[in-house]
Design a protein with these regions (language model features):
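Residue-level recognition of oxygen-bearing side chains
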Residues: 6, 26, 68
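Catalytic nucleophile serine of serine hydrolases
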Residues: 35
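AMP-binding/adenylate-forming catalytic domain of the ANL superfamily
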Residues: 56-68
Length: 83
């Protein structure tokens, strides 16, 4: 599975929905995420991609869509490799 597929699988699992969201769709507006699910999802992302997303970065806009989540994960993966 590529990065986007892994992220999508996490979002679907956390949301308990049966369908996958469109990569640009608002996960909050579509009911995939709320503030409680966001923290669970971030924890899953950190485990899956072996990254650490600081609490100060937990702005819902960073996690608005699959595409935005992919950008955020890539940012922290690049930072982990640079260390």
């Amino acid at each position: 599975m590529n990065k986007r597929e892994r992220i999508t699988a996490i979002v679907v699992r956390i949301s308990n929905k049966r369908t996958e969201p469109d990569p640009e769709e608002s996960l909050f507006d579509a009911g995939y995420l709320d503030s409680f699910a966001l923290t669970d999802m971030v924890s899953e992302l950190e485990k899956e991609f072996q990254i650490r997303i600081p609490d100060s970065e937990l702005n819902p806009r960073r996690f608005e869509s699959i595409a935005r989540i992919e950008e955020t994960v890539a940012k922290y993966m690049a930072g982990a490799h640079a260390a």
